[in-house]
């Protein structure tokens, strides 16, 4: 890169429009959409689509809801010509859809293009010639008058041919190519001359397409150019003002939105921004931007994954995983704080309420996406993501402090592996950490009975070092009695700081899950035990026994050579 880029590049001159009005406008309705996937998008592929893939793309565009589709450049190849003929002769064009074709401003190409449309009910014939100074000077070696003459003569020729083919309802579209780099007064002069040659009416309008063939400036400059033309074009009521932004500077979406605010009636582009160089404006993003503001875009992306896969297959180009609304990762949060916010948002979001969700601008379900991949866990993730995956995938709604405890265990896993932890990975780790049967104390069975004074008596059978022990205890309730019974085999008293229980699923046959937070003298902090069983009391006992096992492991790590179990009962094994 140059140390002083001003020696090679110059800024785009601002547009003199001090009374511009577009900044105070808002988008309130969708523009007319025109898909050029089959023409502009197709010509930019490593391997242009064959007839079968073009037909698949055309039918999908119709299904999405496009009413104007640029189908081909018929004079450029026999493949394109034949495709247009198949659309017409094969009856593939619905009554409410108009196909458009492109041609350069040359008589032989115009005549062949018009012939390709013979028999069509309606058609848009799109003619272009470059108007910017650099093209006039460098490419065509002509002056302003020469460029204008080409545009006017083409319009007159097409009008003459159209009058000889009255079975088709014709719409004329003219594009001053490289409008974004053309002097505004000259672009206006050419367009007004074409208007006079075609003679449109409010009932049969002409389309002036003003392309940012190369995106040269910030989107506000393009908006100024469009508003200037919108104000100054003659017979504006007989004109549809169209824009065709390219994405050379990465701001085509913003340029299109501001252009509509500035007076544009119509937007041309491609699905997912396909097209020459950096691509055309992305019509999916534009449409879903409107949708996210409560505006019907007139295009249906209810199954956007299917649209993406069809486009990938037809174009052989992948959709980027970060592509707005569509990419595999756009509804995914790895960050712990993001995950926690999303989890809380889902907890309070009502089904029919206005969508107010942290980090998710639209409901993924509206575009056919699931919630399965919203929360994904890597080394940067926190408790919210882990909790969401366990709850959404396995029905495990952990208490908040257990979320904190278990997330550190997951963090160790992802740090060690250096990869994402899937929901299945997390569930396996949860089972290994809280539900496995091995440990210093193994639950065997219990019998619970209520005494005359209302207290509870428990007879608990546990396995320690391959020997069964019977422990008995009395307490105010089953958990209190259980703690008293365990005192017979423990060297230090255990206390239950917190306990929760709930059903895993719905119905009478649903298993119960219990969470017990335990602490003991000589053991730092507290630990959780979890139990799952068809019987709620058994689940709670398993949770407490599991928690005691984890306390014993922590005690052994903090005080090597000592055990939480009474002398003579401690097994040699330690709980990891």
Swiss-Prot record:
Q: Which domain of life does this protein belong to?
A: Bacteria
Under which EC number(s) is this enzyme classified?
2.3.3.13
Which SMART domains did the record assign? Answer: LeuA_dimer (SM00917)
**Known catalytic reactions:** 3-methyl-2-oxobutanoate + acetyl-CoA + H2O = (2S)-2-isopropylmalate + CoA + H(+)
What EC class does the entry list? transferase
Give a GO molecular function annotation for the protein: 2-isopropylmalate synthase activity
Residue ranges constituting the Pyruvate carboxyltransferase domain according to the UniProt record: 31-305
The record, for HAMAP family, names: LeuA_type2
Subunit record text: Homodimer.
Q: What is this protein called?
A: 2-isopropylmalate synthase
Originating species:
Ralstonia nicotianae (strain ATCC BAA-1114 / GMI1000) (Ralstonia solanacearum)
Q: Upper lineage ranks?
A: Bacteria, Pseudomonadati, Pseudomonadota, Betaproteobacteria, Burkholderiales
């Amino acid at each position: 890169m140059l140390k002083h880029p001003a020696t090679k590049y110059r800024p785009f001159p601002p547009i003199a429009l001090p009374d511009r009005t577009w900044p105070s406008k808002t988008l309130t309705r969708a523009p007319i959409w025109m898909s050029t996937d089959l023409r502009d998008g197709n010509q930019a592929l490593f391997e242009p689509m064959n007839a079968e893939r073009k037909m698949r793309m055309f039918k999908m565009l119709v299904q999405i809801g496009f009413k104007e589709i640029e189908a081909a450049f018929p004079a450029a190849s026999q493949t394109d010509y034949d495709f247009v003929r198949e659309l017409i002769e094969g009856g593939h064009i619905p009554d409410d859809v108009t196909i458009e074709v492109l041609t350069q401003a040359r008589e032989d190409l115009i005549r062949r293009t018009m012939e390709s449309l013979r028999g069509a009910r309606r058609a848009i014939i799109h003619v272009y010639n470059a108007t910017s100074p650099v093209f006039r000077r460098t490419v065509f070696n002509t002056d302003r008058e020469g460029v204008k003459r080409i545009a006017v003569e083409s319009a007159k020729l097409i009008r003459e041919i159209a009058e000889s083919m009255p079975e088709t309802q014709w719409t004329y579209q003219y594009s001053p190519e490289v409008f974004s780099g053309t002097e505004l007064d000259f672009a206006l002069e050419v367009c007004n001359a074409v208007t006079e040659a075609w003679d449109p009416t409010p009932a049969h309008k002409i389309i002036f397409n003003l392309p940012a063939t190369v995106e040269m400036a910030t989107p506000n400059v393009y908006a100024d150019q469009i508003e200037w033309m919108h104000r100054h074009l003659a017979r504006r009521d007989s004109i549809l003002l169209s824009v065709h932004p390219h994405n050379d500077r990465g701001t085509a979406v913003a340029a299109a939105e501001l252009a509509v605010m500035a007076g544009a009636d119509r937007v041309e582009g491609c699905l997912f921004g396909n097209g020459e160089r950096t691509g055309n404006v992305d019509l999916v993003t534009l449409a879903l931007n409107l949708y996210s503001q409560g505006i019907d875009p007139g295009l249906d992306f209810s199954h956007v994954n299917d649209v993406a896969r069809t486009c990938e297959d037809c174009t052989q180009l992948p959709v980027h995983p970060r592509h707005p609304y569509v990419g595999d990762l756009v509804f995914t949060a790895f960050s712990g704080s993001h995950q926690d916010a999303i989890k809380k948002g889902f907890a309070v979001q009502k089904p029919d309420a206005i969508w107010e969700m942290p980090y998710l601008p639209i409901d993924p379900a509206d575009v056919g996406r699931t919630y399965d991949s919203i929360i994904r866990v890597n080394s940067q993730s926190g408790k919210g993501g882990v909790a969401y995956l366990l709850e959404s995938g396995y029905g495990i709604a952990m208490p908040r402090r257990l979320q904190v405890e278990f997330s550190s265990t997951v963090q160790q896993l992802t740090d060690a592996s250096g990869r994402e932890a899937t929901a299945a990975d997390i569930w396996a780790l949860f089972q290994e950490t809280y539900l496995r049967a091995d440990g210093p104390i193994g639950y065997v069975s219990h019998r619970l009975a209520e005494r005359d004074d209302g207290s509870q008596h428990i007879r608990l059978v546990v396995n320690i070092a391959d020997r069964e022990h019977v422990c008995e205890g009395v307490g105010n309730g089953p958990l209190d009695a259980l703690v008293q019974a365990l005192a017979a085999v423990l060297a230090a008293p255990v206390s239950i700081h917190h306990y929760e229980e709930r059903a895993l699923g719905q119905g009478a046959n649903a298993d119960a899950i219990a969470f017990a937070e335990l602490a003991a003298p000589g053991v730092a902090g507290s630990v959780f035990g979890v139990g799952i069983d068809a019987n709620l009391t058994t689940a709670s006992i398993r949770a407490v026994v599991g928690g005691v096992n984890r306390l014993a492991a922590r005690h052994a790590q903090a005080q090597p050579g000592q055990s939480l179990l009474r002398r003579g009962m401690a097994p040699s094994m330690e709980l990891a």
